[in-house]
Amino acid sequence: MLRYRFAIAALLFLLCGAALAGPERLISGGDAAATPGAGSDRPAEFTLPDLDGRQVALGRFLGKEPVLLVFWATWCPECKAAIPEINAMTTGPLAGKLQILGIDFRESREKVARAVTSRGIRYPVLLDLQGQVARAYEIVGIPTYVLIGREGKVLYREHVLPGDISRYL
C-alpha cells in the first residue's frame, strides 16, 4: 500500500511539472524573462497584480526583508497541504521578519480569490496570468519555494519548504 501511495505521489509531481513545462506554457519576451532568475544569485525582477488589481513589484521588498516566493496553483494538492505551514510563518516567530508572496500560475483572479478565501490563506497572492514569472524562474513543478535574502540573493530554491527557514534569514 505504501508503494502504491508513493507511486501516485510521484506521478502527480511529474504531471504538475509536465503541465508547467509544456510548450504552450512558454512565453517569448516580457520583463521578467529578461532578468536573471533560476541558476543565478540574483532573483528575476517582476511586477504582478494582486487579487485587488494593485501592481506589486519584487523590488519594493529587496534590501528591506527576506522574501519567500511560493509558486503554486489552486489545483495542486501539495500546494494546498503546505498552506497551514506557510500561514504559521505569518504569525509565529518569523512574523515581520519575512515577506511571503504567493504566485499563482495562470489561473483567473476569480478562481484564485475563491481558493484564498476558502483555504484561509493569510499572505499576499499575486497572479502570474501569462506565466512570465514562472518562466523567468524556470519553474517546472509546483509547489516551488524561492527564498531571496535581504541582500537580494537567491538563498533557497526547492519543491519543499526548508525545515528551518530561520537559518537562512
Annotated model-derived regions:
Residues K64-V67, W72-W75, G141:
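Short pre-active-site segment immediately N-terminal to redox-active cysteine/selenocysteine motifs
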